[in-house]
């Protein structure tokens, strides 16, 4: 029996993705960025916070380069996808000295000559910032932080504590990737009590990352431990910038009010985005 696809009168916000070109292991070119953003927009995402990696393995592009590419992309988006709004953040990979590393170097030290992500130049230039504003979400105190998949819960707690001590509100990225959380999803309750916000990936809701991860995600959703669902998009194929399928699933299984909160409202409130 044919069933008409449900329509929604609210759009979504993607707070974690790698759609900014030429700065990490996500979009490679300006045209690829535009294709990804068009795909996101056509599937119901109206606001996108671009979050390039700050990671030893996945990219530490100089902030000047990130800003330059961001402004180039914004100009093209205004011309080609006028209903889409772009914002800028950063996804920070937690290491014990990460905040000292960011704080101790000057942006003026950066030499972007022949910069190319994935080269030794990337490692040598590192992340040169005069202060910590460069990794804030849309200029707020919020910051996305990620950990190694094998990180133990004590390290995650320490990372959250370090964020607060450095003046940030942590948003823990894709918590369903961490083995300790997959084994015991209720550990998230402790992280939330510390004040951390919790983000999961849309494809994990749909089972793309395996049955154990999906089981973990279902537990987190049933307990309403999730604050944000994001795409964590890196490309147009295996890691697409599409939230709509996960939104449909969550709306049906856990209610549209909760879905609207974790796909839109929480991001609007937290990041002080225009409604």
Question: Where do the protein language model's features map onto the residues?
Answer:
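An N-terminally biased module of ancient metal coordination in phosphate/nucleic-acid-related enzymes
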Residues: 1-83
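Extended substrate/RNA-proximal surfaces in nucleic-acid metabolism proteins
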Residues: 60-199
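Mid-to-C-terminal alpha-helical segments outside catalytic/metal-binding sites
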Residues: 3, 243-275
């Amino acid at each position: 029996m044919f069933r008409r696809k449900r329509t929604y009168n609210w759009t979504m916000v993607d707070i974690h993705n790698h759609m900014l070109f030429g700065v990490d292991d996500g979009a490679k070119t300006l045209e690829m960025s535009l294709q990804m953003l068009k795909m996101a927009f056509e599937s119901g995402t109206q606001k996108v916070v671009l979050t390039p990696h700050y990671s030893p393995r996945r990219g530490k592009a100089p902030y000047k380069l990130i800003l330059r590419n961001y402004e180039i992309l914004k100009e093209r988006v205004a011309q080609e996808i006028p209903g889409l709004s772009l914002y800028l953040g950063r996804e920070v990979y937690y290491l014990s000295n990460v905040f000292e590393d960011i704080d101790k170097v000057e942006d003026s030290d950066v030499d972007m000559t022949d910069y190319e992500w994935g080269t030794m130049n990337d490692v040598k230039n590192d992340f040169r910032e005069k202060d910590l504003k460069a990794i804030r979400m849309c200029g707020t105190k919020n910051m996305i932080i990620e950990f190694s998949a094998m990180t133990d819960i004590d390290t995650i707690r320490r990372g959250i504590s370090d964020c607060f001590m450095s003046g940030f509100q942590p948003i823990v990225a894709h918590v369903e990737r961490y083995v300790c959380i997959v084994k015991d999803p209720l550990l998230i309750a402790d992280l939330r009590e510390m004040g951390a916000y919790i983000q999961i990936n849309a494809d994990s809701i749909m089972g793309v990352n395996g049955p154990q991860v999906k089981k973990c995600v279902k537990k987190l959703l049933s307990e309403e431990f999730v604050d944000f669902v994001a795409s964590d998009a890196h490309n147009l194929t295996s890691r697409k910038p599409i939230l709509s399928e996960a939104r449909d699933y969550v709306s049906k299984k856990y209610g549209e009010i909760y879905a609207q909160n974790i796909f839109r409202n929480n991001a609007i409130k937290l990041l002080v985005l225009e409604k």
